[in-house]
Amino acid sequence: MKRTIIMMLDSFGVGASADAASFGDVGSDTFGHIAKACAEGKADIGREGPLKLPNLARLGLGHAAMESTGAFAPGFGDNVELIGAYGHAQELSSGKDTPSGHWEMAGVPVLFEWGYFSEHQNSFPKELTDKILARAGLDGFLGNCHASGTTILEELGEEHMRSGMPIFYTSADSVFQIACHEETFGLDNLYRLCEITREELEPYNIGRVIARPFDGTGPSDFARTGNRKDYSLAPPAKTVLDKLNEAGGEVVSVGKIADIYAYCGITKKVKANGLEALFDATLAEVKSAGDNTIVFTNFVDFDSHYGHRRDVAGYAKGLEYFDARLPEMLALLGEDDLLILTADHGCDPTWQGTDHTREYVPVLAFGAGLKAGSLGRRKSFADIGQSIASHFKLEPMAYGESFL
């Protein structure tokens, strides 16, 4: 029975990529800087001591990062019995955003330029917002700027609840984000507003509209809920997910995967929020998955809760939790199963600002006859998609080189 399980640690980069200068990210290193902070006792909130990832280390994480940066991260070295194949991959795509990373690892790199709202204030064209408001029957909106999602709730959440006006904001990514209170504005109303916005953004080539529902009564307890929804453009070509689907296979999305691919190629969507629930759901789907199935999970907390919020200790604690549960996954794998652990970009929690970082991503692969050892530097995330196509004996993808 052949299956592929993709565990995507959102934002878990392993060192600045060769083109990092073009993004202002030279020196960034999500994994390395977390390990360094832990070793120096600077990440002892809710956890303590050096970063402990014994199972990821056995799969080759420390070695993959060493090949990426030229040195082992603090606490990692050669004194580990490797069981997996490891490498690190360069991104071909033009951006360091979520859709680009995901689409490329499924065999479709983004070789065009996304549209962006680059002005930090008055970010959105009036012509665009006028159309959105008219169609939605709204009198106005708040925000209209680049912002951190948590900070903008503290600043504008109460005014939003009083006025009923949605909060529009963006970032360095190709994204239009809308924050609304689940009770006072209504979740269905927020989703409908996002659908309208997605349609009106067509001429602007914006990658995603993101619904950011929140609850609470004031700045001290406003919090995003688990009902986030992404409205992505569809990939410009068929991904390996589409190809497996068309060949009669199954593609199970756990978390926000289905949204990122605009549901293209997805046969089943499983909703889960938080590292524990996402891991539980992944295990449950692997237990029930039949032949010719991909189970694909995005562990978004690493990015949204820890990377963007520059929470080093939280990121470290999350990684250690993930690592401690990996044996549960390994125990479910059959001889012909392929397990891949990777990331879609970096988001170094020690870096300036709150945005993603342009980094190599780890490619850790286990099973399907792979021998433990180095896969080297991969020229594209698309090598993952090509390897999956090879695993299932599908028609080759246009991009990428299989490591199987």
Curated annotation (Swiss-Prot):
Reaction(s) the record says it catalyses: 2-deoxy-alpha-D-ribose 1-phosphate = 2-deoxy-D-ribose 5-phosphate; alpha-D-ribose 1-phosphate = D-ribose 5-phosphate
Entry keyword set: Cytoplasm, Isomerase, Manganese, Metal-binding
Positions of Mn(2+) 2 binding: D303, H308, H356
Protein name, UniProt field: Phosphopentomutase
GO CC, one annotated term: cytosol
Family: Belongs to the phosphopentomutase family.
PANTHER family: PHOSPHOPENTOMUTASE
Cofactor, free-text remark: Binds 2 manganese ions.
Pfam families: Metalloenzyme (PF01676)
GO molecular function: magnesium ion binding; manganese ion binding; phosphopentomutase activity
HAMAP family: Phosphopentomut (MF_00740)
Top enzyme category: isomerase
Pathway: Carbohydrate degradation; 2-deoxy-D-ribose 1-phosphate degradation; D-glyceraldehyde 3-phosphate and acetaldehyde from 2-deoxy-alpha-D-ribose 1-phosphate: step 1/2
EC code(s) of this entry: 5.4.2.7
Subcellular location: Cytoplasm
InterPro entries according to UniProt: Alkaline_phosphatase_core_sf, DeoB, Metalloenzyme, Phosphopentomutase_DeoB_cap_sf
Cofactor(s) required, per the database record: Mn(2+)
Role this protein plays: Isomerase that catalyzes the conversion of deoxy-ribose 1-phosphate (dRib-1-P) and ribose 1-phosphate (Rib-1-P) to deoxy-ribose 5-phosphate (dRib-5-P) and ribose 5-phosphate (Rib-5-P), respectively.
Principal subcellular localization: cytoplasm
Gene Ontology biological-process annotations: 2-deoxyribose 1-phosphate catabolic process; 5-phosphoribose 1-diphosphate biosynthetic process; metabolic compound salvage; nucleotide metabolic process
Binding, Mn(2+) 1: D10, D344, H345
